[in-house]
């Protein structure tokens, strides 16, 4: 895992200084090394976190003069050894044992289609010296981020949005359509948009080829099928259980590929516990596991250690309980906001930030259970869609959207209000696409391709990489996602959600863990807006910067402030916190 940045200028020399400033902001993503390369119209920079091939042979930017290619890469190609062997049989010669060089050689052999050969998480840029073209690519599920900005006569890219801001020249006006998404989708802004008009993000499963003249060719190379498929027509329930278990086992095993130790973030829930169980079953001994807990606040419990302790004891892990005192929360909130590439409102952002800080003191790589709820239908909004009329888009909107009807106009000031309903339009377009059989399938596809990418996946990447920690997410293995997409929705909805995953796990996990009530990352100090947290919000919303910006109608903000814990979204999040978080993020990043 690393940080990348670069610029391709059109008809001029690249701004090397801007790229260097961008790279400097990526230091936490790559504390083990820094490198840069430039030639005429192109400049590339890299910050390295050493995970595979710890020698200087794996340093980046990596250039092969014989091939005429230079690459910067963030991520991990889990099948790099298999691909290396295949490429060697075809005559390729390697000077390192890095997965970076495998991408370079694969690109030489297969061109932009090389991405279809990769099993992993990645965002990379390859520059062709002779043609002066630049290829940008992002993995199938968008685990690794890649942000883009058009500046005067050039295209810039970076692993984070703040890195692009550091380069200068970026249009930082807010995008009204993106603001509408932010206030509808729990802060998610679907690709290619971001909250800022001048910054875009490359969509998952996408390659973008840019010529020296600025011409662009963008292609999507993968899209999972959420319909029933002929090859699974004869599957029994037991067949599905077995297939899901084996696909999960393969995904977990793949993510142990590293030249450094790999641990697990263990909440004690089904998903992270299954990762631990499968690793123990494969022979991993004294696996390092980590759980986090906070002070209780009133009746709100601050930890789930009793569940993680069961798994740690069952599989004899080297377990670490990490307790965070309440007085660390507010300073950590500031740090977490500064680490966000885009504003994110989930309270567990702070939990991941603090957990990553502690884990990074002893490890560079962990596996984490994000994604299983979206892939295997673990959330509360899926069951009501079973009998939804039509495409199911209206039912999904009523179950999921933070604001419906006239409330958006009551929230946002006229100058920043979208003149249509872009969030509803996006939802209806997505639900109308072929490749999903019913409303539940359509919702799972949307959540897998959009919500998952720009909420939990982005959250984990941003918070772990703030401390130079690489997080790997086996439930986002594309082969596992393809299998889950084909699985009948009734099997996923069973047993209160994730039914097929629960039944698949019964042979390897204690029933007490599988059948426990669904939990969430508990962060009690932020659940109730009071004390120092409420004071911070009040000061932020009444600040000169907020008043000058004028995003929200004052009477709406005043209403929320009078009863800060009474106004909640459909899924139970604070509407006031959502507004304040955006303003805090904008101020933290100098916007």
List the predicted regions and their residue ranges.
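A mobile, often basic/glycine-rich helix-loop segment
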Residues: 376-401
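Cysteine-centered catalytic environments shared across enzyme families
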Residues: 1-340, 352, 503-507, 512, ...
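Short acidic/histidine-rich active-site segments
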Residues: 363-373, 377-379
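Conserved S/T- and glycine-rich ATP-binding loop of Class I adenylate-forming
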Residues: 266, 369, 452
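Acceptor-substrate binding/catalytic loop of class I
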Residues: 344-346
